[in-house]
Amino acid sequence: MFKARAVVFVGVVIAASWFQPSAVSKPQPGGYIVERDADVARTEPGTHKGGGETVGYSFFAKAPGLKMVFRKRALQPGSGIGYHEQKEDEIYYVISGRGVMTIDGKSFDVTPGTAVLTRPGSSHGLKQAGNEDLVILINYEQTPR
């Protein structure tokens, strides 16, 4: 009888561990964090005084010890990221839409599949073009808080 109860108890403990919440909100070493657009979306003006309205998605902004920034931004028609000097390497990747990027005074079109690396000391800005939102991913090294 005792062995049967012990087996049932161990089975219940194992089953309960399967239904514990995953490490979504409090990452542990070797853990992970899952975030979705709907959870992090914020309507914001165009960054760096770029004008217009954008939707910013700052993924993993509260992740302790994370040394990089990973964002998505949807630039609505007429909006942009203002021309500014870059302080660290920054990568832009166009998911959808069209835009015009200006780096160090030279302008060029960006379309889906375009990746741009801006280096420290360069200056750049980005304007949405056309009727569709310009959706981009942005990745750069986190500055110490």
Pin down the residues of each PLM region.
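Glycine- and acidic-residue-biased ligand/ion/polar-headgroup-sensing regions
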Residues: K87-E90, V94-G99, D104
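Histidine-centered metal-chelating micro-motifs
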Residues: G80-I81, V100, V116, P120-L126
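Conserved short histidine dyad/triad with adjacent acidic residue
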Residues: V69-Q86
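A short, N-terminal "cap"/entry segment at the start of jelly-roll beta-barrel domains
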Residues: W18-K67
